[in-house]
A protein has these predicted regions:
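Single-stranded RNA-binding regions, centering on S1/OB-family and related RNA-binding modules
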Residues: 1-161
Length: 161
């Protein structure tokens, strides 16, 4: 079955293990890792919150090289892209509530998941804040920039609720 597969083919795979930032699936007897960024359009903190061992998942083959054992699968094509209609829910200058879900290493700030559309934003914490927000704290933020093509939303922290 593997030699018959081509790029852009749609296949159904079974989840055999779930990690924090990836899942392990079985593709016609071959074990393949799918990273969290290839599963959904939004930021995934923990894959265990979304996927369960034994579930089946519809994926598209992005890259396949059987001789070198290279497989790149993506489930993004079969999920709704919330950034496509993001300006219906969010506007620049608007204030929104969300919860702190991560602290990125390469960028300064925090990652906040908004309550309403369920998307994530990179938020700056102003220097005037004495107490830095903690994991899962509820916060009020103001949006400063929306980049639909890059799937990025920026803002700054107003206050911890």
């Amino acid at each position: 079955e593997l030699p018959k597969l081509n790029v852009n083919d749609t296949v159904r795979v079974r989840i055999i293990a779930v990690g924090v930032k990836h899942i392990l699936v079985e593709l016609y007897g071959k074990e393949v890792i799918i990273k969290a960024e290839d599963l959904q359009h939004t930021y995934i903190v923990n894959c265990k919150d979304y996927y369960v061992v034994g579930e089946y998942l519809k994926v598209r083959i992005k890259q396949i090289d059987i001789t070198n054992n290279i497989f790149h699968l993506s489930a993004k094509d079969f999920t709704i892209n919330p950034f496509q209609y993001i300006r219906k829910y969010i506007e620049v200058g608007g204030e929104y509530t969300g919860k702190v879900i991560a602290f990125p290493k390469q960028n300064s700030g925090i990652i906040v998941q908004l309550d309403n559309p369920g998307i994530t934003c990179l938020i700056r914490v102003p220097a005037k804040f004495n107490s830095y927000p903690h994991y899962l704290d509820k916060v009020l933020i103001r949006i400063t920039e929306i980049k639909e093509q890059k799937k990025l939303i920026y803002g700054y922290l107003m206050r911890v609720i």
